[in-house]
Amino acid sequence: MNEIFQYIYNALRRRYEAGEARALAFALLEDGFGVERTAVYADKVSNFGDAEHKRLNDILSRMENGTPLQYAIGKARFRGEFFKTNPAVLIPRPETEELVELCAAWSKDYLKKKGGGAPLRILDAGTGSGCIAICLAKEMENKAYVEAWDISEEALAVAKENADLHGAKVIFKKRDILNFMPETAFDLIVSNPPYITDDERKDMEAHVLDYEPHAALFVPNDDPLLFYHALAKLAKERLAPEGMIAVETNRMFADEVARLFEENGLEETQTITDCFGNKRFAVGRNILL
């Protein structure tokens, strides 16, 4: 095995189990330095210069202290592309990629049925790193109007950098989902709001609790649907005719979120399972009768 890989692996073994240390070592080399796994196996990794060694040791030092890889290298993969990531925003998850796929497919089908006219209007409520809004803007070839909200100025700064990085046309606004109602309607409302209850903290990994923004993760035990009530009201008031709302949810409450959408007048409400077999998404539509 390559000498640099072994150096990284040995450093990470001081904190992680063998299997996780190995996976992280491969990911660090590929995502942090552009070294593919095949090059490691073939022992064709070029020697690191002084600057690369310094950066590597800085990253390893942070990871040995518990910093997640994505924060240590400053970026995370999402749908095969890199997005700037720091502790002001959540690290994008694979499940959220599925939410983007769902929304992108619906948007294209909606436009095809619509047959032209005004651009599609998309709202990403609680954008974080901006990955959902940016990917949807790119899927629509920057021909849709995409607006993205977050209550955190720090998160919005990261999201704007990511939009510039990817050449995506997104309008970012500081908005509180719980206390704001826009004046105009949207064809698609998408959101991945906080949905983990305080009681679930005990089951979570230390690196998530210690480094990821709690405001983007947790909701009170006595009000787990806090953000979904606001989103349901938003959809009731501002979802365009034939439009759709799609949200990521806690698997324990997906059915309740779908019922909440139905109670607010939406049609074709349903839950959708993720790649791990969990009920992870809830959708609803504003059907014209």
Residue ranges of each PLM-predicted region?
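Conserved hydrophobic residues forming the short capping helix/wall of the S-adenosyl-L-methionine
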Residues: 12, 107, 163, 235, ...
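Mobile active-site "lid"/loop adjacent to the S-adenosyl-L-methionine
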Residues: 195-227
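Conserved Class I SAM-dependent methyltransferase catalytic core
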Residues: 221-286
